[in-house]
Each structure stands twice: as C-alpha cells, then as structure tokens.
UniProtKB/Swiss-Prot annotation:
It comes from the Bacteria. It comes from Cronobacter sakazakii (strain ATCC BAA-894) (Enterobacter sakazakii). Involved in mRNA degradation. Hydrolyzes single-stranded polyribonucleotides processively in the 3' to 5' direction. Gene3D superfamilies: 2.40.50.640, Nucleic acid-binding proteins. Keywords: Cytoplasm, Exonuclease, Hydrolase, Nuclease, RNA-binding. Signal peptide: none annotated. This is Exoribonuclease 2. PROSITE patterns: RIBONUCLEASE_II. Residues 189-516 form the RNB domain.
C-alpha cells in the first residue's frame, strides 16, 4: 500500500533534507568513542556503536542528532577513507587472517586474505602491505582488506627498515644495471691529472662525488677548482638507468645504510673520485677575492682528474686544530688543506655579511650492531673540515646558478620564497610585541629578509626565531631561476652531488650543452614534482626509522633515574615535545606531568609557552632535564617527565 506512494517518498525526502548534517574527519580515542572534527573550533561526539562504521581519519558526512541538548554524529556517507594502502601486522587464528594497521590510533584487526598472485603463506606476526577492499559506509557488512605484499617475518631484526620502506612505497635495493663504456659526448676533456686534487668525506664514504684543488694567485686571490663526478658520461638521457634515476630522484640515506639512486658499480666505483684513479669530471674554476666574493670570471669545462688523497673530516679537522696523530701524506696535500681553510674562512665571512649562514647543528649517527641493534648514538658536531666542503660546494652551486641563468634562463633551481605574503602582517605584529620593528613589505625582499634573520640570530635565545618559523614558506625545486631566501642568495642550483641527486644530473647535462655551445631543452615540471615528492618521502622514511631506533635505544632507560638534557621544540594543548640534546631523540611530555591541576595549566602552541598559575614556566628553546617515563614500542613513542 505504501510501496510506491509519492507522498511518502516526498515526506522522506523532506525529512532527509531538513536533517542537519556535517562533513568532517573522524578522530578516534582509546576509549571506543570518537569525534567528528568539522574544523578547528567545532567537533561532534560519535558514540561507540557508530564508531564501528568508521575508522580514525575517515572523512565523512554525518547526520547530527540532538537529544536532551546533547549533539552527536551518526556517520552516513564516506567522502574519503583514511586507509587505502597501508602496512600492518598479520594475525592468524584458526586459519583466518586479519591485519592490525601500524598506526597509533588504529588498534582493531581488519579481516583479510592474501590477494591472488601473492604466494606467501602468511603467519602470525608477519608484516605485510594491505589494501582496503570493503567499508561499512560503502554498503559493505564490515571492513575487509587484501594482503598485497609480504614485507618480512615478525622476528626480523631489520623490521624498522623494511616496514618503513614498504610504508612509503620506496625501493629496498640498489638498482640493477651496468654501464659498460663511456658515451661519446663530443666533449674535449682537459687533462688535470697532475693537480693535487683531494676529497674530504666521512671515513666510510665510498661515493665520493667532489674533489677540490686550490691555487694562490697574485693580489691575494685564490683560484678554487671544484671537480665533480660525471655519471652523465656513462648514462645517456632517456636510457633505462636514467629513467630509474629519474624515478628515485635521490639516494635514500637511512640510519645504518643507504639505497643508492644509481647502481653501486657506478656510484661507489666507476663514477666515484677514488684516490689514485683517473676519472672523468665536470669542473668549475672560480676566483675567490680577498673579501670572499666570487669574481665574475667563472669557467665550466670537462676534464680528467686524479684524486691525490682520500681525506676524512675528523682527520683534517684534528690536524687543523693541532690535535691527534694524523698527518697529511705529503707537503703538497698539507698545502692544499691550508689553502682550503683560507677559502672556507673567506667564503664564510662573505656569506655572514652578504647572505645567510645556517647555525651549526650536530649530525646524529646511529652505531648499529650486526642485527640492527643500536649500540650507541653519537652526536657529530660540524667541524672545520665539514665547513670547508660546505663552503666550496655552496660557492660551486652559486656559480652554476649564475651560468645557467645567464646562458639558458632555466635549470633545476632550489628556490625559497622566505615568508608567506599572507602572513607578514601577523609576523610584524608578533615581532613588535617582542620589541622588534619590521616592515611587513620589507621582509618579502631578499635584503629585508636577510636583515631580519641577522637580527634574530643576534638574539640571546632562539625563542623568537622559533615563533616565526610557522610564517615561513617551504623550499621548492623549480626550473625557473629565483632567490633562495633561506641561504640569502639571488639564485642557487645544485650540481655537486650527481651520484645521489637526479636534479644535479639534469644540471650537468645543461652545463655540458653550454660548454659545447649547443642548445638545451628546459627540464619538465613533472621531473621537479617527482623530486620534491621523493625528497618528502625519503625524509619521512629517515624520521620513521630513526623513531624506531630511538625507541629501541631508550627502552631500557624507561622508569630509571637516567637524566637527559632536552630542548623544548614544541608546545601543544596536550603537553610539549622535547629533543634530547645528546642523541637527538624526540620525546613527548604529557600535560599532567607538567602540573597536576589542569585548570591552573595553560599550554599555548600560539605563544610557545607553558604557564602555571599565570606564570610562564617553560618556553620553546628552553633546555630542561628529563627522565624517560615510558617507551611504547608499538607506536615508537618516547614519553618523558621533567626532573622536579
């Protein structure tokens, strides 16, 4: 009787259109209920039975019910699922498989089966890649996934590496492929094998891609010759190896090992500027004036060079600081090191005055055992030898940026626009409240930005600097020349690491076209998009493996009285994040550990401060002592507590 009743259908339609709805993202809690977050200000409660239809992170449209003045959300339509492809641990019970996603807020096992064509016999504890196939809001009875790839066994000591690489869909191994002979590039190569080129790297480095040689000229000028490994002498554009390198975009450096962009035969041997071996190179010769400026007379050319010494950062630094027993192999090498130190001092002084110099932060190195166990974490400060190489490379990249801009008008450039124009008024107001006056338009210019950075660097603490970081834009990779505000330079194009960066290989080919007087094609924007995406994924992978190893390293310190100095790096509503000074681990201090009475505590992300009873007790950049309260291995998170 009611089946096709148009009035009833109309009534249903009316009710449906009058019912309030909201779109938002589901946030799960550990208690079974959840919230629909519509925006930063508004969220609705989702009761536990309704949470069974959704997953943390799902974007949904929900019906909003009001009962006794209490609002709650009933998820109705899935806009975008949080999980599509994911990694997790397999559970096997009575021959039935399920998988628990590796995510701090996803605790429930999802029923699953192996996809057709996946031959591995999955066992309890295995790690796998899975893809979601069913979702309750799509009309399915429940969640369901398919296992698309076996990652490794639960007991594998190298789980942190394999799981992280699978999560970000990154390669596990060096690419296959060989380059048997050098290409005929129609390039005249100068013979520089008699010159005393040296390489300075970590003692364990095999992929040496830069060698340096300095000559003193009259008029207190120094001539610096930078020779860079030449993989494009072996790899033709559009070849199989070139396409592999284009996809990988970078060598992926993870704690303990790297996954190279090029086959190891090339990166660690044929192209590597090994001591005592003749190698093709792309070379830049420049003159450094007495005040550290680079003269306009920049010369790029192809050459054959032979490194006369493979030097290690620590040895060179010790020798220059008159420590330790190491001595250069000959007076000629000693003379090179002294001249390189002069180059470094001149360039550093010039950049301090005319551009910007990053503050030295230590690198943290994981010392690993045979089974991936963390034996130690060593802070390696950036010493004089590191700075020699850094200043030489920055100078060479400035030269390439100028030459590519003036001769071609394009290349692969690293650009950084400084502050986001939409937020400079806010920035000026914030700085003014701390007694610093800046013009909102002035900081959008390179000189204005540099002036502000120098003023911030002169502050007694880094607190103000940390407050304005959120107004800064991100560095980008562009085919158009443009300023790099972060370095304080008008243009910056890297070409000094072609073994490990595809963009540098592209710039090599463009520089070679200039050397030969040939025309060149502008790199495609898709290539720079791929580079930016790979850079992001590689950084995330490095961070994820690091978090896992830090958790392993600090596990036996949990609940003990071991004290660690820690710098506060961020304040949020729930507490504050700190970085342990000695090893670089990031830990979280929950708000209740800061003060027991919640109403007397204000944690402000906006101000970067923690106030107790109206008084600022902690602020970002403060260094405090902490102990490790807990290490949660399943989420790789470290919980710390301030020492009273």
């Amino acid at each position: 009787m009611f089946q096709d009743n148009p009035l009833l259908a109309q009534l249903k339609q009316q009710l449906h259109s009058q019912t309030p709805r909201a779109e938002g993202v589901v946030k799960a809690t550990e208690k079974g209920f959840g919230f629909l977050e519509v925006d930063a200000q508004k969220s609705y409660f989702i009761p536990p039975p309704q949470m069974k239809k959704v997953m943390h992170g799902d974007r949904v449209i929900a019906v909003i019910h009001t009962e006794k003045e209490k609002e709650s959300a009933e998820p109705e339509e899935l806009i975008e699922p949080f999980l599509t492809r994911f990694v997790g641990r397999v559970q096997k019970k009575d021959d039935r498989l399920s998988i628990v996603p590796d995510h701090p807020l996803l605790k429930d096992a999802i029923p699953c089966r192996a996809e057709r064509g996946v031959s591995h016999d999955f066992q309890n504890g295995d790690w796998a890649v899975a893809e979601m196939r069913r979702h309750p809001l799509k009309g399915d009875r429940g969640f369901y996934a398919e296992l698309t790839q076996f990652i490794t066994f639960g007991e594998d000591h190298f789980v942190p590496w394999w799981v992280t690489l699978a999560r970000h869909n990154l390669e596990r191994e060096a690419p296959d492929g060989v380059a048997t002979e050098m290409l005929d590039e129609n390039l005249t190569r100068e013979d520089l094998t008699a010159l005393d080129f040296v390489t300075i790297d970590s003692a364990s480095t095999e992929d040496m891609d830069d060698a340096l040689y300095v000559e003193a000229l009259d008029g207190d000028r120094l001539q610096l010759t930078v020779a860079i490994a030449d993989p494009t002498a072996w790899i033709a554009e559009g070849s199989k190896l070139d396409n592999i390198a284009k996809v990988r975009a970078f060598t992926n450096y993870l704690p303990g090992f790297n996954i190279p962009m090029l086959p190891r035969e090339l990166s660690d041997d044929l192209c590597s500027l090994r001591e005592g071996v003749q190698r093709p190179a792309l070379v830049c010769r420049m003159i450094i004036e007495a005040d550290g400026a680079i003269s306009d007379d920049i010369h790029f050319f192809a050459a054959i060079i032979e490194s006369k010494a493979k030097l290690a950062y620590d040895d060179v630094s010790d020798w220059l600081e008159e420590k330790g027993d190491w001595q250069p192999g000959s007076e000629a090498i000693a003379a090179q090191i002294r001249l390189l130190q002069q180059i470094c001092q001149r360039r550093s002084a010039w950049r301090t005055e005319h551009a910007l110099v990053f503050k030295d932060r230590p690198d943290y190195r994981f010392v690993l055992g045979e089974k991936g166990e963390v034996l130690d974490i060593v802070a390696e400060p950036r010493r004089i030898a590191n700075r020699i190489v850094e200043e030489s490379m920055i100078a060479a990249n400035i030269c390439a940026a100028r030459v590519l801009r003036d001769k071609l008008g394009f290349g692969v450039y690293n650009v950084h626009a400084g502050f986001d124009p939409a937020s400079t008024e806010q920035l000026a107001t914030l700085l003014q409240s701390h007694g610093m006056h800046v013009d909102a338009n002035d900081v959008l210019t390179l000189p204005g930005f540099c002036k502000l950075r120098r003023e911030l660097d002169a502050q007694p603490s880094g607190f103000l600097d940390s407050r304005i970081r959120r107004f800064q834009s991100f560095a980008e990779i562009s085919t158009e020349p443009g300023p790099h505000f972060g370095l304080g330079l008008e243009a910056y194009a890297t070409w000094t690491s072609p073994i490990r960066k595809y963009g540098d290989m592209v710039n090599h080919r463009l520089l070679k076209a200039i050397i030969k007087g040939e025309s060149a094609t502008r790199p495609q924007d898709e290539a720079t998009v791929q580079m930016a995406e790979r850079r992001r994924l590689n950084r995330m992978a490095e961070r994820d493996v690091g978090d896992w190893l830090y958790a392993r390293f600090l596990k036996d310190k949990a609940g003990t009285d071991s004290r660690f100095a820690a710098e506060i790096i961020d304040v949020s509503r729930g507490g504050m994040r700190v970085r342990l000074v000695d090893n670089g681990a990031v830990a979280f201090i929950p708000a209740p550990f800061l003060h027991a009475v919640r109403d007397e505590l204000v944690c402000s992300q906006e101000n970067g401060t923690v106030q107790i009873k109206g008084e600022t007790v902690y602020k970002v950049t403060d260094v405090i002592d902490v102990t490790i309260a807990e290490v949660r291995m399943e989420t790789r998170s470290v919980i710390a507590r301030p020492v009273a």
